[in-house]
């Protein structure tokens, strides 16, 4: 204690310096490896440090690739009428190989379009449709009757013969209607109307 009261020499100062142990570079590398949660070879040298930096930069590049890929998809769909609403979903996407499979990805959610049936729709009621179908034969018969009367008045024998054959075939069809109703009961237009009694048509003269 007596030596402390006198002048302090440089040698005494060195005695009071706290002992600081120099850290080995290999120990520093081990500490950094434990902090990152990854195990790397602890070979001392500049190559190992470069590989460690390259691994961290590769992870950052993967994140950038994922973001750029999603942004490019949004830019492509913009202006085409597609909804570009971003919905964050926690699920992996297989759109890019370089993207990480853990994290939040943005997926485009398109509006659900209502499915339209391709079946033809009836724009007319059944009653109006039946009325139109029944008016067509009446118009045809009236025109045919007028043409037949003109041909008979002119005296063309061949025309009169062809018209007579057509009329006979029509009469035969009218006579067969009751039998056709029993054989084909799925025709709604014929079933809705009662079968009227067929009047005997006078034979046309072949003069």
Swiss-Prot record:
InterPro entries: Corona_nucI, N2-like_embe-CoV. It is found in: Virion. Keywords: Virion. The lineage of its organism: Viruses, Riboviria, Orthornavirae, Pisuviricota, Pisoniviricetes. Belongs to the coronavirus I protein family. One of its GO terms (cellular component) is virion component. This is Protein I. Structural protein that is not essential for the viral replication either in tissue culture or in its natural host. The gene encoding this protein is included within the N gene (alternative ORF). Pfam families: Corona_I (PF03187).
């Amino acid at each position: 204690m007596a030596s402390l009261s006198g002048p302090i020499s440089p040698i005494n100062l060195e005695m009071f310096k706290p002992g600081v142990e120099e850290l080995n570079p290999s120990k520093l590398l081990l500490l950094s490896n434990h902090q990152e949660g990854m195990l790397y070879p602890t070979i001392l040298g500049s190559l190992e440090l470069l590989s460690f930096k390259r691994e961290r930069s590769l992870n950052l590049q993967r994140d950038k690739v994922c973001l750029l890929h999603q942004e490019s998809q949004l830019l492509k769909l913009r202006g085409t009428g597609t909804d570009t609403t971003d919905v964050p979903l926690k699920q992996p996407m297989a759109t890019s190989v370089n993207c990480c499979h853990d994290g939040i990805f943005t997926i485009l959610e398109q509006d659900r379009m209502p499915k339209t049936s391709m079946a033809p729709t009836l724009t007319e009621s059944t009653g109006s449709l039946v009325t139109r179908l029944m008016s067509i034969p009446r118009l045809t018969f009236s025109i045919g009757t007028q043409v037949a009367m003109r041909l008979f008045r002119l005296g063309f024998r061949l025309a009169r013969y062809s018209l007579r054959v057509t009329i006979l075939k029509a009469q035969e069809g009218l006579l067969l209607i009751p039998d056709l109703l029993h054989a084909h009961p799925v025709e709604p237009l014929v079933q809705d109307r009662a079968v009227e009694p067929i009047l005997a048509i006078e034979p046309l003269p072949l003069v």
